[in-house]
Design a protein with these regions (language model features):
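Short coil/turn segments at beta-strand junctions that form active-site/ligand-binding loops
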Residues: 2-3, 23, 97
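Short amphipathic alpha-helical segments
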Residues: 17-20, 112-114
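Extended, basic/helix-rich recognition subdomains
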Residues: 88-168
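Extended, charge-rich low-complexity interaction segments
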Residues: 1-4, 58-73, 152-168
Length: 168
């Protein structure tokens, strides 16, 4: 059976009302990629409250983006100068007090740690490493969908309530 498989879930409501008229649509039942990367089969879902306010969650891939934090801060300082640039950076990142590196086991976290140490030049934050996994991504690749996935038949429209988890 043909199907369209997405690697992201609700993602800031960007997938709401999504519908495929002729093909089955499959996507992870997660409100954002952070929840998905923190999920581990052997532990299960973390409650939304475990995703801490004030934490900026990062992975190695995040640091490879040419518009990631360091290049962004450098660009702001270059355009606006030191004083105004620092104010702008504070407005963007001021509510974050901790950067949580998600160790999914898919890459060497040491390189990520080095990057985060450089981030401290721009932000006054603590840095920690938290355990995550690629369990959901592996299920996407294998097609081994479980109750962590939403499967829509052709013509079905994606609704926010489909992302709700039945608490046990």
């Amino acid at each position: 059976m043909d199907e369209i498989v997405l690697t992201y879930g609700l993602c800031g409501n960007s997938t709401l009302d999504l519908m495929s008229p002729n093909t089955r649509l499959v996507l992870p039942k997660f409100d954002d990629c952070i929840s998905q990367l923190l999920y581990r089969d052997r532990i299960g879902r973390r409650s939304r409250s475990e995703i801490q306010k004030g934490h900026l969650y990062v992975t190695r891939g995040w640091t490879l983006d040419p518009e990631a934090l360091i290049p962004q801060c450098q660009n702001i300082l270059k355009i606006y100068g030191k004083d105004i640039g620092k104010e702008i950076i504070s407005q963007i990142y001021g509510e974050y007090y901790k950067i949580s590196m998600i160790d999914t086991g898919a890459y060497d976290v040491i390189g990520l740690e080095h990057y985060m140490k450089k981030v401290k030049k721009y932000l006054d934050v603590q840095i920690e490493c938290v355990s995550g996994s690629t369990d959901i991504l592996e299920k996407i690749i294998s097609g081994n969908y479980d109750d962590n996935f939403i499967i829509l038949n052709p013509g079905e429209i994606l609704e926010e309530k489909m992302f709700r988890i039945n608490e046990k």
